[in-house]
Curated annotation (Swiss-Prot):
This is Flagellar P-ring protein. GO terms for cellular component: bacterial-type flagellum basal body, distal rod, P ring; outer membrane-bounded periplasmic space. Pfam families: FlgI (PF02119). The basal body constitutes a major portion of the flagellar organelle and consists of four rings (L,P,S, and M) mounted on a central rod. GO terms for molecular function: structural molecule activity. The lineage of its organism: Bacteria, Pseudomonadati, Thermodesulfobacteriota, Desulfuromonadia, Desulfuromonadales. Residues 1-24 form the signal peptide. The keyword Signal applies. Its main location: periplasm. Keywords: Bacterial flagellum, Periplasm, Signal.
Length: 367
């Protein structure tokens, strides 16, 4: 009887240990090793095989590009004889991840720069992709995946999603590697994605506790310097993997992000407000206009005329007064504002007013 109980306790302890602290995040998810980053690539190319939805003849650079490409392939054509209805000039962009090797593939994004109606069904011709230094790092080619449609005639068109932008998964072949390697050394430098003094301090404490040595030291709110133990300086890969798998609980500033265009509101759990009373009413204005016919009496010299009849109705909903006490949480704020029937767009106006009153203890970001 005792053995099953001991086994159950051991399993429970293992599960609790594996789960880690509540809200914990791996170091690799909130910080990155300095120098390890992706590089942006860009190129100019042509998409062919379009069903009459390509650039018009007035797009001179598309015509010239097609003529130049044909000449490089050994075909001589006259500019005046070229039609580009099935061709579109595009800009091709991609990101070259760190440690990408020659022969590996990366995704590319293809965007029309002319007046093409759609890139559906098109194929990108061989396009060199260059970095900021002007060197070619990859070459892209292949059929596009657009995920949209656009049909129509002279009087009407039907469009779904965005047909002038497409992707080619694995469409670029890496031809040149970015020169970077982890050289044996004594120090590593990490940069936080969201700089915060509390988070970087917790990172240093977690690393020092795990390795039982004072290896990590915070340089500022966004960077951490780590000393590699002497016995692992020649092989830092295992040390980095062990370090980045550590869990910590990141901290952040209290922030409310609102988008007035879409009515979207995102609030963090640490948002607090001081004691404040909120009253919000809606003003509704209804204007209607109808044409009334004024008919003169029989045998009179009057004329029949059309007289506009305009009516206006103004109504204002009663604004309920809600008092929110100091230090209430975001859940309390949401429940209180929902109680007065506030819509997302109403909430945006309310939060701006609370911020202006000095009662919102959080950063208000308006997109």
């Amino acid at each position: 009887m005792l053995r099953p109980i001991i086994t159950l306790l051991c399993l429970t302890l293992m599960l609790c240990t594996a789960a880690g602290p509540a809200g914990a995040t791996r170091i690799k998810d909130i910080a990155r090793l300095q120098g390890v980053r992706s590089n942006q690539l860009v190129g100019y190319g042509l998409v062919v095989g379009l069903n009459g939805s390509g650039d018009s003849d007035s797009t001179a650079f598309t015509v010239r590009s097609l003529v130049n490409m044909m000449e490089r392939l050994g075909v001589t054509v006259d500019v005046n004889d070229v039609k580009v209805d099935n061709v579109a000039a595009v800009i091709v962009t991609a990101e070259l991840p760190a440690f990408s090797k020659t022969g590996s593939t990366i995704d590319v994004l293809v965007s029309s720069i002319g007046d093409a109606d759609s890139l559906v069904g098109g194929s990108l011709l061989m396009t060199p992709l260059k970095g900021a230094d002007g060197k070619i790092y990859a070459v892209a080619q292949g059929p596009l995946a657009v995920g949209a449609l656009a049909f129509g005639g002279k009087a009407a068109t039907v469009q779904k999603n965005h047909p002038t932008v497409g992707r080619i998964p694995g469409g670029a072949l890496v031809e040149r590697e970015v020169p970077f390697r982890l050289t044996p050394g004594a120090e590593l430098h990490y940069q936080l994605t969201n700089p915060d003094f509390t988070t970087v301090t917790r990172m240093a404490q977690a690393i020092n506790k795990h390795f039982q040595k004072t290896l990590a030291r915070a340089e500022d709110s966004g960077s951490l310097k780590i000393t590699i133990p002497e016995d692992q300086q020649n092989e830092p890969i295992h040390f980095i993997a062990d370090l980045e798998s550590l869990n910590i609980r990141p901290d952040s500033m209290a922030r409310i992000v609102v988008n007035e265009k879409t009515g979207t509101i995102v609030m963090g759990e640490d948002v607090r407000i001081a004691t404040v009373a909120v009253s919000h009413g809606n003003l509704n204005l209804i204007i209607s206009e109808n044409d009334q016919v004024s008919q003169p009496l029989p045998f009179s010299e009057g004329e029949t005329v059309v007289v506009p009849d305009t009516s206006m109705e103004v109504s204002e909903d009663n604004g309920n007064l809600v008092v929110m006490e100091m230090g209430v949480s975001i859940g309390d704020v949401a429940r209180a504002l929902n109680a007065i029937g506030a819509t997302p767009r109403d909430l945006i106006a309310i939060f701006q007013a609370i911020k202006a009153a000095g009662a919102l203890h959080a950063e208000l970001v308006v997109l």
